[in-house]
Amino acid sequence: MDMKASGHHKVAIIGSGNIGTDLMIKVMRHGRSLEMGAMVGIDAASDGLARAARLGVPTTAEGIDGLVGMPGFGDIRIAFDATSAGAHAHHNRVLQQHGVRVIDLTPASIGPYVVPVVNLDQHLDAPNINMVTCGGQATIPMVAAVSRVARVHYAEIVASISSRSAGPGTRANIDEFTETTSQALCSVGGAARGKAIIVLNPAEPPLMMRDTVFTLSEDGDEAEIAASVEAMAQAVQGYVPGYRLKQRVQFERIAASAPLNIPGLGPMSGLKTSIFLEVEGAAHYLPAYAGNLDIMTSAALACAERLAETRLSA
C-alpha cells in the first residue's frame, strides 16, 4: 500500500485504536481525494501507531500537541477525531485555530449531526461535523426513509453489537451514545420523539451488528414506505456494502381505540413500521462482525471525500 500521489488532500487521524486504524486503512486503500498525513495517538506501543509507521504514515504518540508540532501539519486539511467525547472539545479548539476541518467520530456533538445519505450536503461548510454514533449511522437513514413519506411521531431503535467489537472508547461513551442517537433520530431522522438502546451481546462466536427500527407515524401508504426504505438501504450500501435489510418491512396499524402510550406525547395511533437491519463489516482491519465500527469509518470517509471534492478543491 503506497501513499497516494501528490494532489490529494492530506488528512490526520487522531486516535490510534480500532476505529482510527480501520479508517487509516480505508483512506489508504480507497481514498479518491485523500492521503494520510498523520496518525496521532497517546500510546507509543499501540498497534495502530506501529501499523501506521510500517505503512509509511508519519506518526506521533504525543497527542494533539504532537500533531501540531509535526513538520507536515501545515498540509493537513481534514482531521478525523476517533478518541472520546471528553477529549474532543480540546482537540477541536486546537484544530479550529489552525483552520483544519474536523470530522468527529466521538459522541461529543460539537458540530451538526451528519448522516451522509440524509443531510451531508446541508453541512459541507461546517468547520466540525459529528458522525453521531454507529447505531445512528445504521438507523437514522431508515427513520428518514419513513419520514419522507409519512410524518413520524416516534422512533425507537435497538442497536445490538458484539461485546468483542466494543472497545474501551465505546464502553466509556454508552450514555453519550444513547443521548446523541436519540437526539439525531429527531434532528436528522425527522421523528418528533426518539429513543435509542444499545445492547452489547457477549455471544461467541461474535454476532454481526443488528439493528431494529420501530417508527410510529401518521397513516401512510405501506407500499410507498417500503419502497422508500429499500431505496434508502441501497443508498447506504453505496458506502457500506455490508448494510442490508434482514427481512421485508413490517407494518401494523394502531387504532385510536387501542393507542400506544408514547413518553412525552401520550396516547398515539397511526402506522407502526418495523425495520430489521444487519451490518457486516468490510474487514479492512476489524473483523467482519464489527459492522458497528465499519459503518462509522465508512460514513466518515464518505463525508471527507465529499468535503475534499466540493469544498477543498474550490
UniProtKB/Swiss-Prot annotation:
Keyword entries, A-Z: Aromatic hydrocarbons catabolism, NAD, Oxidoreductase
Active site: C134 (acyl-thioester intermediate)
EC number(s) from the headed UniProt entry: 1.2.1.10
The UniProt record lists the keyword Oxidoreductase: yes
Family label: Belongs to the acetaldehyde dehydrogenase family.
Gene expressing this chain: mhpF
CDD domains recorded: ALDH_C
Organism encoding this protein: Cupriavidus necator (strain ATCC 17699 / DSM 428 / KCTC 22496 / NCIMB 10442 / H16 / Stanier 337) (Ralstonia eutropha)
Keyword Signal: no
Alphabetical list of InterPro entries matching this protein: Acetaldehyde_dehydrogenase (IPR003361), Acetylaldehyde_DH_C (IPR015426), NAD(P)-bd_dom_sf (IPR036291), Semialdehyde_DH_NAD-bd (IPR000534)
Bridged cysteine pairs (disulfide): none
UniProt protein name: Acetaldehyde dehydrogenase 1
One Pfam family named in its UniProt record: AcetDehyd-dimer
HAMAP family named in the record: Ac_ald_DH_ac (MF_01657)
GO molecular function terms listed in the Swiss-Prot or TrEMBL record: acetaldehyde dehydrogenase (acetylating) activity; NAD binding
